[in-house]
Amino acid sequence: MAFHKLVKNSAYYSRFQTKYKRRREGKTDYYARKRLITQAKNKYNAPKYRLVVRFTNRDIILQIVSSEITGDKVFASAYSHELKAYGIEHGLTNWAAAYATGLLLARRVLKKLGLDETFKGVEEADGEYKLTEAAETDDGERRPFKAFLDVGLARTSTGARVFGAMKGASDGGIFIPHSENRFPGYDMESEELDAETLKKYIFGGHVAEYMETLADDDEERYKSQFNRYIEDDLEADGLEDLYAEAHAAIREDPFKKAESEAPKKTKEEWKAESLKYKKSKLTREQRAAGVQERIAALRSE
C-alpha cells in the first residue's frame, strides 16, 4: 500500500472536528461511558446508576452516580479516609480498604433508601462469589438496588483494587452484575475461585504476610515502611480482627463521623486561611517607606 502524506491545507482545517474536551485531556473513555449511561427506552424515567471507583495516592473515592442531560448526579459517596471513624487508621488505599469503603457506600445507599433491613448482603465475609438477589417482603418480591461498575481509565487486571471496592459494595447489599474471574484467587486453568485467597485479601491477610516477611528479612526496612503501624502497636496478627470489627461497625452505623474530626470551617475562615499565605500588593506609600528604611540602613553602616 502506498504511503500518503497528510496534507494539512485549508480544506483539512475547515473540516477538522475536535474531540470532546475530556477526551483531549485523557480523562474520559467515551466508548465505555456511552454504554454505561444509555438506559433502555422502555424504562422511561428510571435512572441508570453507576458505581464509580477512583483511586488517588492517599484516598479511595466511591460514588453512586446517575447521568442526566444537565450532568451527572451523585446519589451517595464514601471515601477511604472515613474509615478512620471505624478504627482503620492505616493502609487506606490497599485492597482491604477498598472492600471496606465499598461496604460503607452500600450500607449508606440502602440506609438512605430505607432498604438496609431488607438487603443485608453478606454479613460475615467468607470470600465466596455471591450476587444480591430479590428479597421477599410483606408487599411481595422486592428487587435490590442495581448499579453498574464504572472503573474509568483504570486497568481491569485480575485482582485489581477496583474489584475489591465492587466486592465490598456487592457484599453490602447492592446488586452489581459481575463474574468471579477478576477476583484474587481465581484460577484461569481450572476456572474456579479460591474463596480462602479472596477472604485473605478482604481481611488484609496479604498485608499481614508481607509485614511478617519483611520483619524477618529486613527489620530496618520494616520499621521504615510500617512505622505508623508500630507507633499504634498494630501487628500483623491483629489486622484480621481490626477489619472484622470495622465491617461490623460500618453495618451498625454507616454515617459515623471520626471523633477527632473538627467542626467544618466557615467560608470566612477558609478565606482568612488562604489570605495568610497570599502576599498582598504594597501601596505606593508602603513602597516609598520601604525604600527610605533601606536608605537609612545603608547610611548607618
Swiss-Prot record:
It comes from Neurospora crassa (strain ATCC 24698 / 74-OR23-1A / CBS 708.71 / DSM 1257 / FGSC 987). Transmembrane segments: none annotated. PANTHER family: LARGE RIBOSOMAL SUBUNIT PROTEIN UL18, RIBOSOMAL PROTEIN L5-RELATED. The lineage of its organism: Eukaryota, Fungi, Dikarya, Ascomycota, Pezizomycotina. This is Large ribosomal subunit protein uL18. Its main location: cytoplasm. It is found in: Cytoplasm. It holds the Pfam family Ribosomal_L5e. Keywords: Cytoplasm, Ribonucleoprotein, Ribosomal protein, RNA-binding, rRNA-binding. The keyword rRNA-binding applies. GO terms for biological process: ribosomal large subunit assembly; translation. The keyword Ribonucleoprotein applies. GO terms for molecular function: 5S rRNA binding; structural constituent of ribosome. Component of the large ribosomal subunit (LSU). Mature N.crassa ribosomes consist of a small (40S) and a large (60S) subunit. The 40S small subunit contains 1 molecule of ribosomal RNA (18S rRNA) and at least 32 different proteins. The large 60S subunit contains 3 rRNA molecules (26S, 5.8S and 5S rRNA) and at least 42 different proteins. One of its GO terms (cellular component) is cytosolic large ribosomal subunit. Component of the ribosome, a large ribonucleoprotein complex responsible for the synthesis of proteins in the cell. The small ribosomal subunit (SSU) binds messenger RNAs (mRNAs) and translates the encoded message by selecting cognate aminoacyl-transfer RNA (tRNA) molecules. The large subunit (LSU) contains the ribosomal catalytic site termed the peptidyl transferase center (PTC), which catalyzes the formation of peptide bonds, thereby polymerizing the amino acids delivered by tRNAs into a polypeptide chain.
